Amino acid sequence: MERTQRKVRMGKVVSDKMDKTVVVAVEMKVRHPLYHRTITQTKKFKAHDENNEAKTGDTVVIMETRPLSKDKRWRLIEITERAVAL
């Protein structure tokens, strides 16, 4: 039996305060059904970060996975861009 294709999203880390968990904000462009204008929607996902590698401001890739807790259904795949430290 083959495994189905899992969803992959790219977003920005907005919180890394939890242990082994990051909150990733993903922006999606959708068209309004009535006014046909492009709207930017932001959705936040809690993702599993096993080694606590990602920091706030990093751009990351997350992939859908089995439920890991009440809210976590995504896991960190890679950090594509590090945030600039001030």
Swiss-Prot record:
One of its GO terms (cellular component) is cytosolic small ribosomal subunit. It comes from the Bacteria. PROSITE patterns: RIBOSOMAL_S17 (PS00056). Keywords: Ribonucleoprotein, Ribosomal protein, RNA-binding, rRNA-binding. Gene3D superfamilies: Nucleic acid-binding proteins (2.40.50.140). GO terms for biological process: translation. GO terms for molecular function: rRNA binding; structural constituent of ribosome. Signal peptide: none annotated. It holds the Pfam family Ribosomal_S17. One of the primary rRNA binding proteins, it binds specifically to the 5'-end of 16S ribosomal RNA. Belongs to the universal ribosomal protein uS17 family. PANTHER family: 40S RIBOSOMAL PROTEIN S11 FAMILY MEMBER, SMALL RIBOSOMAL SUBUNIT PROTEIN US17M. Part of the 30S ribosomal subunit. This is Small ribosomal subunit protein uS17. It comes from Desulfitobacterium hafniense (strain Y51). The gene is rpsQ.
